[in-house]
């Protein structure tokens, strides 16, 4: 049978030969051609009406005939003259790139399953075509010169050749062969099935200009367009090749609708179309909306008032509640009970600073002191009578002047108070009349107190039963002498000052607390 020339047989066929009809065309798109090196099945060619739930395959019908028959199916090019294609059919009953089998005599309709397409590489095209000629797989007897032309490796057609027995001639009579519609490789972008997968929105203004993001299967940026159509009206989406992203996404702007004065929304069809072969995708619905005339809602914004805004904020479920009160920081307050006794002036006490004195005085207890260098338990005010101190407190004007100048607290009049209670308090008055004190005397006093021998000599003088604590400088003695008299209504400062400072007979006092005062700060404030 391979030695027959089909053109001679077809030309000599009688007019009563039954025709062959393709009643189920192969599906044009959706199938992928497989290379032989992939090592897997090439699949099965589906029918045109095949779905996921109902599978169909290419089907033919031999009209006006029912009986034994033989069929050969091969691959040819889509353009006329149909040349043998270098690709091969693979599957059951396939050899040398074509399918051949006996048909059942009990029926006239025949369906073909398990037919796959196996593609060849470009460098193997010439060898594959030469093999078709050697195996007499050239249904249209194309000349060798025409076989050297280029081949479209992404498109093939099925050629059905049916043979029935001729009882008179004793041979197989070929029936007129038929060629199916093209089958495209789904892997190639220029022949693949067009499909819109998703869009970011499916409505826009009738004036056009809305930006749409469209996701699709692989397309070629130079061979694709987006079509909007309704009846006889058609318009293309506006985009350039740069707006096609990696062959799977297109960003375009919608065209204006044919009637920009519509008062109701209009639904149109949106499709992908390939200009090279006029292939289109399944349509997707797009809705044109009437023009509102105010795209930025300026008129609506002008109508908004402050009351409307407050009402909106109040009813908004995401609106915040009442304004939070200002956050307050808790600060610890030291509540010191104030004394009801009248406030008496005292010596200024500076703010505590780091002392630079090179010595540290020991803590002495009055009841355990037996050596001559210990402190006296009490100091009588009569000891200071020889110094010429006045018993009168300073006048109110002098007291106010001292308080405004030094801002140091005074000691209360209680002679038994501790030195801790003599620290500055908020409501205590200040002693501020030390302007006559010579700063050099304080410096001398500070230098003299640094030696323990001098301190011991100052604590007690030999030959006296009640000595003074130390020899006061001349300027301090002069200040004490110039105090107002007690007859003027003032209070005595000597008793509260001296006894409050040196009364250590009743409780334990640290001697070092007096010398740790920062005299440098005091001197700098009085300058």
UniProtKB/Swiss-Prot annotation:
Task: List, alphabetically, the Gene3D superfamilies matched.
Answer: Immunoglobulins (2.60.40.10), Rel homology domain (RHD), DNA-binding domain (2.60.40.340)
Carrying Phosphoserine, the residues are: 276
The keyword Signal is assigned to this record: no
Domain RHD intervals: 18-306
Cellular-component GO terms for this entry: cytoplasm; NF-kappaB p50/p65 complex; nucleus
GO molecular function ontology, one term from the record: RNA polymerase II cis-regulatory region sequence-specific DNA binding
Q: Position of motif Nuclear localization signal?
A: 301-304
Motif (9aaTAD) positions are: 513-521
Q: Where is this region: Transcriptional activation domain 2?
A: 494-527
Report the SMART domains cross-referenced here.
IPT
Against InterPro entries, the record matches this protein to: Ig-like_fold, Ig_E-set, IPT_dom, IPT_NFkappaB, NFkB/Dor, p53-like_TF_DNA-bd_sf, RelA_RHD_N, RHD_CS
Task: Return the annotated region ranges for Transcriptional activation domain 1.
Answer: 381-444
Membrane spanning segments where? none
Q: Which domain of life is it from?
A: Eukaryota
Keywords recorded for this protein, A-Z: Activator, Cytoplasm, DNA-binding, Nucleus, Phosphoprotein, Transcription, Transcription regulation
Q: Where is this chain's protein located in or outside the cell? A: Nucleus; Cytoplasm
What's the main place this protein lives?
nucleus
Query: What processes in GO biological process is this protein linked to?
Result: canonical NF-kappaB signal transduction; cellular response to hydrogen peroxide; cellular response to lipopolysaccharide; cellular response to tumor necrosis factor; inflammatory response; innate immune response; negative regulation of apoptotic process; non-canonical NF-kappaB signal transduction
Q: In which tissues is it expressed?
A: Predominantly in the animal hemisphere of the oocyte; all tissues of early embryo.
The job of this chain, per UniProt, is described as: NF-kappa-B is a pleiotropic transcription factor present in almost all cell types and is the endpoint of a series of signal transduction events that are initiated by a vast array of stimuli related to many biological processes such as inflammation, immunity, differentiation, cell growth, tumorigenesis and apoptosis. NF-kappa-B is a homo- or heterodimeric complex formed by the Rel-like domain-containing proteins.
Q: What is known of its domains?
A: The transcriptional activation domain 1/TA1 and the transcriptional activation domain 2/TA2 have direct transcriptional activation properties. The 9aaTAD motif found within the transcriptional activation domain 2 is a conserved motif present in a large number of transcription factors that is required for their transcriptional transactivation activity.
Name of the featured protein: Putative transcription factor p65 homolog
UniProt organism field:
Xenopus laevis
User: Which gene is transcribed and translated to give this protein?
Assistant: rela
């Amino acid at each position: 049978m391979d030695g027959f020339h089909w053109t001679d047989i077809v030309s000599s066929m009688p007019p009563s030969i039954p025709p062959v009809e393709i009643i189920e065309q192969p599906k044009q798109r959706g199938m992928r051609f497989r290379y032989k090196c992939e090592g897997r099945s090439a699949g099965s060619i589906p029918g045109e009406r095949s779905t996921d739930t109902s599978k169909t395959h290419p089907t033919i019908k031999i009209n006006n005939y029912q009986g034994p028959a033989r069929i050969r199916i091969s691959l040819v090019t889509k353009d006329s003259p149909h040349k043998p294609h270098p690709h091969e059919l693979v599957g059951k009953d396939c050899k040398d790139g074509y399918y051949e089998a006996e048909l059942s005599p009990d029926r006239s309709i025949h369906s073909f399953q398990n037919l796959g397409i196996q593609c060849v590489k470009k460098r193997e095209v010439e060898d594959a075509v030469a093999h078709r000629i050697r195996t007499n797989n050239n249904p249209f007897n194309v000349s060798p010169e025409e076989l050297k032309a280029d081949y479209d490796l992404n498109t093939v057609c099925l050629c059905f050749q049916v043979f029935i027995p001729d009882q008179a001639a004793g041979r197989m009579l070929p029936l007129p062969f038929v060629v199916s519609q093209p089958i495209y490789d789904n892997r190639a972008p220029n022949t693949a099935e067009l499909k819109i997968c998703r869009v970011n929105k499916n409505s826009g203004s009738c004036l056009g200009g809305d930006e749409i993001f469209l996701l699709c299967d692989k397309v070629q940026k130079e061979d694709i367009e987006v079509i909007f159509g309704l009846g006889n009206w058609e318009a293309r989406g506006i985009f350039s090749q740069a707006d096609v992203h990696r062959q799977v996404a297109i960003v375009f702007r919608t065209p204006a609708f044919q009637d920009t004065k519509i008062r109701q929304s209009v639904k149109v069809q949106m499709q992908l179309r390939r200009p090279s072969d006029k292939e289109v995708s399944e349509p997707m619905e797009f809705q044109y909306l009437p023009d509102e005339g105010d795209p930025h809602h300026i008129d609506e914004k002008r109508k908004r008032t402050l009351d409307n805004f407050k009402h909106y904020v109040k009813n908004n479920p995401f609106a915040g509640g009442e304004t939070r009160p200002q956050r307050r920081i808790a600060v610890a307050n030291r509540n010191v009970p104030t004394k009801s006794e009248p406030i008496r002036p005292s010596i200024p006490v500076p703010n505590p600073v780091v002392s630079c004195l090179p010595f540290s005085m020991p803590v002495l207890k009055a009841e355990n002191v037996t050596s001559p260098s210990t402190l006296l338990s009490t100091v009588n005010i009569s000891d200071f009578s020889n110094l010429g101190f006045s018993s009168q407190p300073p006048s109110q004007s002098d007291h106010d002047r001292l308080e405004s100048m030094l801002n140091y607290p005074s000691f209360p009049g209680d002679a038994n108070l501790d030195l801790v209670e003599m620290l500055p308090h908020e409501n205590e008055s200040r002693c501020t009349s030390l302007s006559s004190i010579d700063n050099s005397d304080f410096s001398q006093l500070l230098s003299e107190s640094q030696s323990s021998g001098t301190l011991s000599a100052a604590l007690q003088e030999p030959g006296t039963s009640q000595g003074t604590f130390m020899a006061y400088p001349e300027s301090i003695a002069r200040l004490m002498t110039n105090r107002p008299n007690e007859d003027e209504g003032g209070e005595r400062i000597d008793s509260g000052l001296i006894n409050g400072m040196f009364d250590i007979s009743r409780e334990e006092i640290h001697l070092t607390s007096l010398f740790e005062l920062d005299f440098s700060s005091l001197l700098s404030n009085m300058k």
